[in-house]
């Protein structure tokens, strides 16, 4: 007699009958369209006392942002922030270019110093 025989294999359970838990089938067509229609409107939510709407892929404050700053002010600040970031990137690029120029000039200066030292040594040997 095997140690682990058929004692441990359970019987297969019969499949369950599908019973709809929804009462949508009992509603008439107009009520279903009203409840589940395609016109959902814009999604809105209230978060920390602030009403937000989902427009064009972004959550936007419905009226006034907490702290008294309105929508136009935030747009102006975002635009100014974008301008400052672009200016910052341009200035970083200029600094990188200037550092490259400085390192190139320094390398050329060291090469010329070496050449000058070698010429001095050869000139002293001739005398």
From Swiss-Prot:
The keyword Coiled coil applies. The modification Phosphoserine is found at residues 9, 20. Keywords: Cell projection, Cilium, Cilium biogenesis/degradation, Coiled coil, Cytoplasm, Cytoskeleton, Differentiation, Flagellum, Golgi apparatus, Nucleus, Phosphoprotein. Residues 77-98 are annotated as: Leucine-zipper. Its main location: nucleus. It comes from Rattus norvegicus. 'Chibby' is Japanese for 'small'; the gene was so named for the RNAi phenotype seen in flies. Belongs to the chibby family. Inhibits the Wnt/Wingless pathway by binding to CTNNB1/beta-catenin and inhibiting beta-catenin-mediated transcriptional activation through competition with TCF/LEF transcription factors. Has also been shown to play a role in regulating the intracellular trafficking of polycystin-2/PKD2 and possibly of other intracellular proteins. Promotes adipocyte and cardiomyocyte differentiation. GO terms for biological process: canonical Wnt signaling pathway; cardiac muscle cell differentiation; cilium assembly; fat cell differentiation; floor plate development; negative regulation of canonical Wnt signaling pathway; negative regulation of DNA-templated transcription; negative regulation of Wnt signaling pathway. This is Protein chibby homolog 1. Pfam families: Chibby. GO terms for cellular component: centriole; ciliary basal body; nuclear speck; nucleus; sperm flagellum; trans-Golgi network. Residues 68-110 form a coiled coil. GO terms for molecular function: beta-catenin binding; identical protein binding; protein homodimerization activity. It is found in: Nucleus speckle; Cytoplasm, Cytoskeleton, Cilium basal body; Cytoplasm, Cytoskeleton, Microtubule organizing center, Centrosome, Centriole; Golgi apparatus. Residues 1-25 are annotated as: Disordered.
């Amino acid at each position: 007699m095997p140690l682990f025989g058929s004692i441990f294999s359970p019987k297969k359970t019969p499949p369950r009958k599908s019973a709809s838990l929804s009462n949508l089938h009992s509603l008439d067509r107009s009520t279903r369209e009203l409840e589940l229609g395609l016109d959902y409107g814009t999604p809105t939510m209230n978060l920390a006392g602030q009403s937000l709407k989902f427009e064009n892929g972004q959550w936007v404050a419905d009226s006034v942002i907490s702290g008294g700053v309105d929508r136009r002010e935030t747009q102006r600040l975002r635009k100014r922030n974008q301008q400052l970031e672009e200016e910052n990137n341009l200035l970083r690029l200029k600094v990188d270019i200037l550092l490259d120029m400085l390192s190139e000039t320094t390398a050329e200066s060291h090469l010329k110093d070496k050449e000058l030292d070698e010429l001095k040594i050869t000139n002293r040997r001739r005398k």
